[in-house]
Amino acid sequence: RESFLCFLPLIIAILFGLMETSRFTIITTVVIWYAGVLGARITLQENLNKFFDKRSKRFFLFASTLFVGLFILLDWLRQAQGELVAYLVLERLKAYLFGYLAAFSNWVTMIHDGNIQFGQSTFAGPLSLTGIVERKFGSYGPILIAGDLSTNIYTALRGLIMDFSILGTGMIMILIGWFGSITYQNVIRGKLFFLIPLTLFYAFTLYSPLISIFHYNSLIMSWVILAAFFLLAKPIVQNSWDKDGFTGIVFNQ
C-alpha cells in the first residue's frame, strides 16, 4: 500500500503524458518526485553512506528502460501513429538525450558577455508572473547538431551565462554548491523547513540538462505549497534521536 501511494504520482503523470502525448508532464513529475525522495531519505538518514545501493541501481535500470519505451511510444503517437521507423526514432532519441552537449558547445563558442540579462532567462517564470519582464515562449531556437538533426535544448547553463556571464555563472555555481551543503546539514539536524531549498536544489540539478526549472511557475508552486504547509501547520520535530536517526513529526493541536 505504501509503495503504491509512493509511485501513484508517477503513474498519474504517465497516464496524462500518454493522453497528451507530452514528455514534459512525465519528466517534470519524475524530477519533482525524485527530489522529494532524496529529501525524504536525507531526513530519515536512510543509507546515506550507500546512496546508490542495489535497490537504487535496479530502480534506475528499470526507470531508464521505461523512459526509452515511453519516448518511442510518445514519438509514435506524435507522428499520428504513422510508420514507426526505427532509425528516425533512434536519431530523435539520441538528440533528446545527448543533443544538449553539442548544442551548448556550439552556442557557447558564439557568445560574448556584453549583453547580460540579470536573471531574465533563468528566472523567466517568476519575473513574467510579477510583470517585470515578458517571457518569450518557446525558450530558445533550434540549432543543427548533426546533418539535418536539430535541438533547442541547451541546458540551464545557457540561461545562467546569458544572465550573469561565464565568470558570473562560475561564481554562482560555487554559491549554489555551498548553499546546497548548508541546507543538507540543516536537514540532517532535523530542521525540516530546509527541505524546501534542498529539494529545490535537487530538482534544479536534475532538470538542468534541459533548462532552468524556474521557467515554469506551475513547478515552482510545488515549493510554495510546501512552504505554506510548514508555516501554517507549524510542525515540531521530536528531539528524540536514536541510532536510526529521525523519529517522526508531531503537530500542534
Please report, for each region that a protein language model flagged, where it lies by residue:
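Alpha-helix capping and helix-coil boundary motifs
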Residues: S3, Q81-V85, V133-K136, P209-F214, ...
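Extended hydrophobic/Leu-rich segments
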Residues: L48-F51, G114, I236-V237, F246
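Juxtamembrane/interfacial segments around transmembrane helices
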Residues: I32-G39, K57-G69, M110-S121, S222-F229, ...
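Hydrophobic alpha-helical segments of polytopic membrane proteins
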Residues: E2-Q79, A86-Y87
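Hydrophobic alpha-helical segments
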Residues: N152-Q253
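Small-residue-enriched transmembrane helix-hairpin modules in multi-pass membrane proteins
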Residues: F60-F179
